[in-house]
Amino acid sequence: MNQQILRTTVDHLVVLASTLEEGARWCTHLLGVTPLPGGQHPLMGTHNRLVNISSFAYPDTYLEIIALDPEAISQRAPGLKRWFDMDDPVLHAQVVRDGPQLIHFVARCPDVLPAMQALGALGLDCGQVIKASRPTPEGLLQWRITVRDDGQRLLGGALPTLIQWGEPGEAEPAHPTQTLPYSGLQLQGLLLTNPTPELIESACEAIGLAGMQVQNGTPGIRATLQTERGLVQLSSPPH
């Protein structure tokens, strides 16, 4: 089990936008890159656009701009919330007022269950494992992802949602970066902040998530991206 846990790595950053069109404009203006079409998530009633941000330190990593799909309705059971706090009215109001925001990150592992158990041993409830998918021109992307019934991010987004791509035991599961071209953007660092930084450090160690900076502060994350215009920092809004 420890070998599986030690392979946990950053998979993607999550930027929430009020609409995908606004998210695309934000990305083009701030980062100098137009995000490519992603797809729809029928279970959650959301859709996305993607940008490759892979780097030497963070290989096979991308930025996801996500928004509610106006042409879809969440298929979650009554009372269950969408992922990434997307049903939180306070977060929604912040995004409407201030524009697209970095709100979270997702970490991948070959088996999501041991990582969930490791966090659970620290009193951190990841919720349930949900099987999800979306069609692409290259075929069906499939994954298993942790989602709480209340949709909340762990520690205000400072700890990742966990994802396992493909079917269990699949040797080379399909991943979005396999079809995302080089964008000129590279993830250089992630800073995780929380009033209890020792809990963040223990959680990262428990799931084998290396390369994170941890500081005492308001719950959230800050990502540093190398762009063709220089370094750009994205910070999550106050939680």
Tell what function each PLM region has.
Residues 10, 102-104:
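Eukaryotic phosphotyrosine signaling hubs
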Residues 24-91:
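Glycine/small-residue-rich interface belts in oligomeric ring/scaffold proteins
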Residues 15-19, 109-110, 190-196:
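Short, surface-exposed ligand-recognition loops at beta-strand->loop->(often short) alpha-helix junctions
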Residues 39, 50-67, 89-97, 104-185, ...:
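Vicinal oxygen chelate
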Residues 20-32, 115-122, 196-207:
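Amphipathic alpha-helical segments
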Residues 2-20, 28-33:
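Hydrophobic, proline/glycine-rich low-complexity stretches
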Residues 10, 14, 26-27, 89-92, ...:
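Proline/glycine-anchored alpha-helix kink/cap motifs
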Residues 8, 97-99:
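Structural motif
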